[in-house]
Amino acid sequence: MAIVNEQILELLKNDQEYYAGVGKNYLSNSDIGTLLNNPKEFGVPREDNKAFMEGRYFHQLILEPEKAKDIKYVDASTRTTKIYKEFCEENNLPFCLLQKEVEDIQNLVGIINGNIAFFEELYKKGNQYEIPAVGEIQGMMWKGKADIVTDDSIIDLKTTSDIDKFKWNAKKYNYDSQCYIYQMLFGKPLVFYVIDKTTGVLGIFRPTEEFIKSGEDKVGRAIEVFNKYFGPNPTDDIENYYIDEYLF
């Protein structure tokens, strides 16, 4: 893991800097899917939406409860109601959560904190929360921000709509490349702590060497695409991009 300027790491603790400031100088796991599936979208800012906001609030309740207190939400049945639109306008918000959505997330966190095994691991003495790291991987500079850094692992919190399918869908959502990138940046294996949003069932998912190798290969392919279209010496124009595959 490369030695980096402590000032950069301090800046990256701030979400604004991480996503829109100095953090833009680095690739991240969120770029993997874009580069491999639709590189024309690389670098295009993504608007906040329900999924992003729910995920952020879920993480804040567990990792940064002081920030969670600042969330603005409205007691409305849908986002098409007058009360919702007026609330967003009065608070200068492009989007906000509904009270029932906030309560659902609070219930999920209550289930997690009510499980002894989860609680002891998530809040173990010495754990560090929301820790950024940067480093060189396969010739490119990458960033990552760990939910929880323990003595011997990185814990990443996830929600899922179907925990029975989590291990089958993990590569689809690029959790394999996340495991590889974070292990390279932090020098520790990444473990997923997961809760099913529908049933409340909890699960712990640990990556195998094969899973991490899949992530390593995926990172290599993403770097090839980046260099082809966006590197210092690109060999093609992104406007020429198209998909060329065989059907089986």
Residue ranges and their predicted role:
Residues 1-143, 240-246:
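Metal-dependent nuclease catalytic cores that hydrolyze phosphodiester bonds in DNA/RNA
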Residues 62-67, 159-162, 187, 227:
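Hydrophobic/aromatic-lined pockets within catalytic cores
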Residues 124-127, 131-218:
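Mg2+/Mn2+-dependent nuclease catalytic core
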Residues 219-248:
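Polybasic (Lys/Arg-rich)
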